A protein has these predicted regions:
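Repeated loop/turn-to-beta-strand initiation elements of outer-membrane beta-barrel proteins
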Residues: 104, 142-146, 201-205, 259-263, ...
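Residue-level signature of outer-membrane beta-barrel architecture
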Residues: 136-139, 197-199, 254-257, 293-295, ...
C-alpha cells in the first residue's frame, strides 16, 4: 500500500525521500592481517572510502548508459518511452556521477551530409545534422527513480526548407507545403522528466512527459534506432511512423513488467510550426495507447493507435487516426526493424506505409546498412491547378550503403560513408521525376559515446 501511495505522490515527495542507494552504504572494514587469506578476488578487496564532500569529486567514464528506469533485462530505452531490444545495447555517452548520487550523461551526434537527389525534381545540398542529449537521473527512494532529459539540435540553421529528400512530404516552409524535402528538426527536441516506482518484483509504474516530449505512438524515432544509425537521410515515411517524436505537450502514464509495457498518452496533435527556434504552446488535445512486448533481449514488438487533432497545417479541419506496428531484432552486430503504419484522415482516405531497415556491423571498422520503404502518398502535387493534385501514388524507395568506422578512443566514433537510393513508382510520375532517378549521399558522422 505504501508503494502505491508513493506512486501517486511521486513528484511532491521526491525532494524529501530517503536515498537508499548503494553509493551511501558504509565501507566494510578490511579483515585483520593475521586472518586475511591469500585471495585476490575482487569481492574481497576492501571498499574504498567515499570522497570527502568538500572535494565534490566526479567520476567520469565512458560506458553504456544504464537502461532507462524500469526497462528490465529484455529492453533498453529508445526515444520517449519507447523500448528497443536489450541486445542493441543501451545508448553510450559521457557519464559523471556526482556525490549527490546524480548520474549525468551527455551524448551527441554531428553529421556532415552532401546529397544529390536525382531526376528533374531532385536537388543537391550540403547540410549539417546535429543532436545533443543531456540527462540527469538518480534514485529518490529504495524503489523509485527519476530522470530529467533535454535534447537539442542546431538544424534550424539550415533554413526552413530543410534538405532535399526525393518523395518526402510533410509540414510547410514559408507557408508552402514541403515536397521532395525533409524539414529540419526544432532546436528543442525534448525537455522531459520521467519517474518510476516499483510496486512488485519485476513490475513498475511510470509517469513521463514535459513541454517537449514524445507520446506513446509508433516505434522509437529513426535517429534513435540502431537499425538506422548510419542512414544519412530521414525515411520518406517519417510522417507515417514517428513524426510525433517532437511534440509540444505530452503526458504519458504506463506500467512495465519484464515482458510487457502498456502506456497511454495525452498530447498536442499539431506538428511543430515553421518557427524552429522556439517552443510552441503546449496543449493536450489528442491521445494514444501503445503495447510493447519484449519476450527476450533480442526481440521487441509494439502496436499503437492514436487520435491526432489536426496534425498537419496543410490539411485544416482534418484529424487523423494513426495505427502502427513494428518488430525489432538485434543480435551481435545486426539490428533490424520491420514496420507498418496506417493513417486515416478524418474525413479522408487511409494511407499506408511499410518500412524495413537494417544495420550490420561486420567488424570493428565496417558496417553495411539499408532501408526499403513503400508509401502511399497524395501530397506530391500540392498545386490545386495541377492535374495530379491529390492523386494517390504508391512509391517504393530502396537505399543501401556502407560506413567505415574509426573509433576515437573510448569517447567517440567517426564514421565515413555513403549510400545510393533508387525508386519504383507509377509511370504517371515519369514526366515529373524522370524514368529512373538515382540519389547519392555522402556523410561524415561524429558521435560522442556511440
Amino acid at each position: 500500500m505504501r508503494r502505491l501511495l508513493f506512486a501517486t505522490l511521486l513528484f511532491p515527495v521526491a525532494a524529501a525521500a530517503q536515498d537508499h542507494s548503494m553509493h551511501d552504504m558504509p565501507a566494510q572494514p578490511a579483515p585483520a592481517p593475521q586472518e586475511a587469506p591469500v585471495d585476490h578476488s575482487m569481492h574481497d578487496m576492501p571498499a574504498q572510502p567515499a570522497p570527502a564532500p568538500q572535494e565534490a569529486a566526479m567520476d567520469h567514464s565512458m560506458h553504456d548508459m544504464a537502461a532507462m528506469p524500469g526497462m528490465g533485462a529484455n529492453a533498453v530505452g529508445g526515444s520517449g518511452s519507447a523500448l528497443l531490444p536489450a541486445a542493441e545495447g543501451a545508448m553510450r555517452g559521457f557519464h559523471a556521477t556526482t556525490t549527490g548520487n546524480w548520474m549525468l550523461m551527455a551524448h551527441g551526434v554531428l553529421t556532415g551530409v552532401y546529397t544529390d537527389q536525382g531526376g528533374p525534381r531532385g536537388d543537391d545540398m550540403a547540410v549539417v545534422q546535429s543532436m545533443a542529449m543531456l540527462s540527469a537521473s538518480r534514485p529518490i527512494a529504495e524503489y523509485a527513480r527519476i530522470e530529467f532529459r533535454a535534447m537539442l539540435s542546431l538544424e534550424p540553421a539550415m533554413g526552413r526548407r530543410g534538405y532535399p529528400n526525393l518523395f518526402a512530404t510533410g509540414e510547410t516552409a514559408n507557408g508552402r507545403p514541403l515536397v521532395d524535402r525533409q524539414h529540419p528538426h526544432d532546436l528543442f527536441m525534448e525537455l522531459s522528466a520521467r519517474a518510476d516506482v516499483d510496486i512488485a518484483p519485476g513490475t513498475s509504474l511510470f509517469l513521463y512527459g514535459g513541454p517537449v516530449a514524445e507520446p506513446a505512438l509508433g516505434p522509437s524515432a529513426f535517429m534513435h534506432r540502431r537499425s538506422a544509425r548510419y542512414l544519412p537521410l530521414s525515411p520518406i515515411g517519417h510522417h507515417w511512423f514517428d513524426s510525433t517524436h517532437i511534440t509540444y505537450g505530452v503526458v504519458t502514464a504506463g506500467a512495465k513488467t519484464d515482458a510487457f509495457q502498456f502506456e497511454g498518452s495525452a498530447f498536442k496533435g499539431r506538428e511543430p510550426d515553421e518557427a524552429r527556434w522556439n517552443i510552441d504552446t503546449p496543449r493536450l488535445d489528442s491521445w494514444s495507447v501503445r503495447a510493447t512486448w519484449t519476450p527476450s533481449p533480442h526481440w521487441t514488438a509494439q502496436i499503437s493507435h492514436g487520435r491526432l487533432k489536426e496534425p498537419e497545417v496543410q490539411h485544416p479541419g482534418e484529424d487523423e487516426a494513426r495505427t502502427t506496428a513494428s518488430l525489432h531484432y538485434a543480435r551481435g552486430g545486426l539490428s533490424a526493424m520491420l514496420g507498418f503504419s496506417a493513417k486515416n484522415r478524418l474525413p479522408g482516405d487511409t494511407l499506408t506505409a511499410w518500412v524495413g531497415e537494417a544495420n550490420w556491423d561486420l567488424s570493428r571498422h565496417h558496417s553495411l546498412f539499408g532501408r526499403i520503404e513503400n508509401v502511399a502518398n497524395d501530397e506530391l502535387f500540392p498545386d490545386h491547378a495541377d492535374p495530379l493534385h491529390d492523386r494517390l501514388f504508391r512509391i517504393t524507395r530502396f537505399e543501401a550503403g556502407y560506413a567505415h568506422r574509426i573509433p576515437l578512443g573510448k569517447a567517440a566514433e567517426l564514421a565515413l560513408g555513403g549510400s545510393l537510393a533508387a525508386y519504383a513508382k507509377p509511370a504517371a510520375l515519369d514526366a515529373a521525376y524522370g524514368k529512373a532517378p538515382i540519389s547519392g549521399t555522402l556523410f561524415a558522422r561524429l558521435a560522442l559515446g556511440q
